[in-house]
UniProtKB/Swiss-Prot annotation:
Belongs to the universal ribosomal protein uL2 family. It comes from Clavibacter michiganensis subsp. michiganensis (strain NCPPB 382). The gene is rplB. GO terms for biological process: cytoplasmic translation. Disulfide bonds: none annotated. Residues 32-53, 225-279 are annotated as: Disordered. This is Large ribosomal subunit protein uL2. The keyword Transferase does not apply.
């Protein structure tokens, strides 16, 4: 993938860029793998906003992705197409299996149309093949990793993501995540070889607010720019600093919000941001 930059023909085009989509081989998705994807605008069944900054955007259909890949062991598949997916930053690959079935998977880097891939403990170590962690050599770069055996891939799914298998210790495999965290994962869990493609996605400059609206992202308004009825930082004559420590719209003090002492914490060998003081 490469980034195509625009000339500053308008203020919105100045500095903006777009993916060149050179790796895409088909513009229409596989109909049998599409599902409806209604929009809710960040609202619950009572009509109240539960997630801010969501609304509008282009209509989408959900592409059903096979994150488990555990029911086609030993069945050879051919990469029929590399496609765009509006629901994720990564590209997706359409597989045609020799038994006639079709599946979508996350497209790893260097996977191309016509490649042969498979899953199972005996699969070769090459991009796109899916194996249990205990069958993958130490030092291999992987993605689409399960956290529980048979639970489907949960980690390493976004564009450019890569996780390294650094060690194996009894029933566990040690993984170095993109955040820097080193974590134990059950060695029976599956992962796919290679890193996720479309790595230049993070370098795209969206250029104008309208492009984010096309993506379904609404504006993020500062609390100090609101009225007192809308936010604890709102109001005041002229520009103000908010007059208090930063808080959320509901009065919760800013800072880290992740719960500590989760049951899964015992699987963390080295935390991300190790040594950083928690607030």
């Amino acid at each position: 993938m490469a980034i195509r930059k625009y000339k500053p023909t308008t203020p919105g085009r100045r500095g903006s860029s777009v993916a060149d989509f050179a790796e895409i081989t088909r513009s229409t998705p596989e109909k049998s793998l599409l599902r409806p994807l209604p929009k809710h605008g960040g609202r619950n069944n009572a009509g109240r906003i539960t997630t801010r900054h969501i609304g509008g955007g282009h209509k989408r259909q959900y592409r059903v992705i096979d994150f488990k890949r555990n029911d086609k062991d030993g069945v050879l598949a051919t990469v029929a197409h590399i496609e765009y997916d509006p629901n994720r930053t990564a590209r997706i690959a359409l597989l045609h299996f020799i038994d006639g079935s079709k599946r979508y998977i996350i497209a790893p880097n260097k996977l191309k149309q016509g490649d042969k891939i498979e899953s199972g403990p005996q699969a070769d170590i090459k991009p796109g093949n899916n194996l249990p962690l205990r069958n993958i050599p130490t030092g291999t770069v992987i993605h689409a990793i399960e956290l529980r055996p048979g639970g489907g891939a949960k980690m390493g799914r976004s564009a450019g993501a890569s996780v390294r298998l650094v060690a194996k210790d009894g029933p566990y495999a040690q993984l170095r995540l993109p955040s820097g965290e080193i974590r134990n994962v059950d060695a029976r869990c599956r992962a796919t070889i290679g890193e996720v493609g479309n790595a230049e996605q993070s370098n795209i400059n969206w250029g104008k607010a309208g492009r984010m609206r096309w993506k379904g992202v609404r504006p993020t308004v500062r609390g100090v720019a609101m009225n007192p009825v809308d936010h604890p930082h709102g109001g005041g004559e002229g520009k103000t600093s908010g007059g208090r420590h930063p808080v959320s719209p509901w009065g919760q003090k800013e800072g880290r919000t992740r719960h500590i002492n989760k049951p899964s914490d015992k699987l963390i060998v080295r935390r991300r941001n190790a040594g950083k003081k928690r607030k």
